[in-house]
A protein has these predicted regions:
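Alpha-helix N-cap and loop-to-helix initiation/capping positions
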Residues: 39, 110-117, 146-157, 184-196
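Alpha/beta catalytic barrel-like cores
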Residues: 1-128, 141
Length: 208
């Protein structure tokens, strides 16, 4: 556990933050299309290489979350992307969930998937240079959402993910995101977000 503490402290040292650069290929394609740049693997690499080569990286960024494609790429001079990020003093993270799908028993709410085969993927990501990970749970909010089913199912998935990540020697970022969409009040948002977070803490406590 001391090694995990060391990783967490290094990411947040001197008030630094985390750069989320884990856009999927589809999202990157939309961004490049908006500036009339063809989205192929090389152009996506050039974009990220330029971003991670900034002199400000060492001043502001303690960790960078990558997408599966990116952690496997090499720069024009032969460095791996993780090596480029490490050279600025930042640590490499990786998004490990595989996206949200409709939750069984619900017509609208979602469950984040990716637990199948996760232990093996984590071991590979560690060898590729990752030292922390991210998993995002998504919750709708309305007069009837998030339901007890959604809250408990996503909390359980987040807790299992976190336990596997720590087993692999990495720090898990747990991201329970209650979406802002809707006409609910700030009070309702606070109440339901608190319920989600409390359930996540409870689930994590059972696996550690």
């Amino acid at each position: 556990m001391s090694e995990l503490n060391k990783i967490a402290l290094q990411i947040l040292s001197n008030g630094k933050g985390i750069l989320a650069a884990d856009e999927s290929t589809a999202t990157m394609t939309k961004r490049l299309d908006s500036v009339k740049v063809h989205s192929d693997e090389n152009n996506r690499l050039l974009f990220r290489q330029t971003l991670f080569s900034s002199s400000s990286m060492s001043e502001c960024i303690g960790g960078v979350i990558l997408y599966d494609e990116t952690i496997r790429q090499r720069t024009s001079n032969g460095k791996t992307i993780p090596e480029l990020i490490n050279s600025s003093g930042s640590l490499v993270g990786i998004k490990v969930d595989t996206g949200a799908k409709i939750l069984a028993g619900s017509k609208e709410e979602k469950i984040t998937e990716g637990l199948d085969g996760l232990r093996e993927r984590l071991n590979e990501y560690y060898e590729l240079g990752a030292r922390f990970t991210k998993w995002r749970g998504v919750y709708l909010i309305s007069d009837k959402y998030p339901s007890k089913l959604s809250i408990s199912s996503n909390a359980h998935a987040l807790a299992r993910y976190a336990a596997l990540v720590q087993e692999a020697g990495m720090v898990p970022i747990i991201e329970p995101e209650v979406l802002m969409d809707g006409d609910h009040s700030a009070k309702d948002c606070l109440m339901k977000t608190s319920e989600v977070i409390n359930k996540c803490y409870e689930a994590v406590s059972y696996t550690h």
